[in-house]
From Swiss-Prot:
GO terms for cellular component: extracellular space. This is Beta-defensin 131A. Highly expressed in testis. Is moderately expressed in the prostate and small intestine. The gene is DEFB131A. It comes from the Eukaryota. Disulfide bonds join 29-56, 36-50, 40-57. It is found in: Secreted. Has antibacterial activity. Upon stimulation with lipoteichoic acid, promotes cytokines and chemokines production and secretion.
Length: 70
């Protein structure tokens, strides 16, 4: 009987706790500068997951302060 109550308790918690990703939010990449793919390129970093479980990649912003002179 305790096992049955435990199973029902776990099931009720699973259905009452909201999912990690909201169904209301948009699962697409936000603009044309972002791309959904399975692996980001070397000059990109991952931002979020897309709807098909690929990764939304964005170009890295690399700032060069100038060349060091020795």
């Amino acid at each position: 009987m305790r096992v049955l109550f435990f199973v029902f308790g776990v099931l009720s918690l699973m259905f009452t706790v909201p999912p990690a990703r909201s169904f209301i939010s948009n699962d697409e990449c936000p603009s044309e500068y972002y791309h959904c793919r399975l692996k980001c390129n070397a000059d990109e970093h991952a931002i979020r997951y897309c709807a098909d479980f690929s990764i939304c990649c964005k170009l890295k912003i690399i700032e060069i302060d100038g060349q060091k002179k020795w």
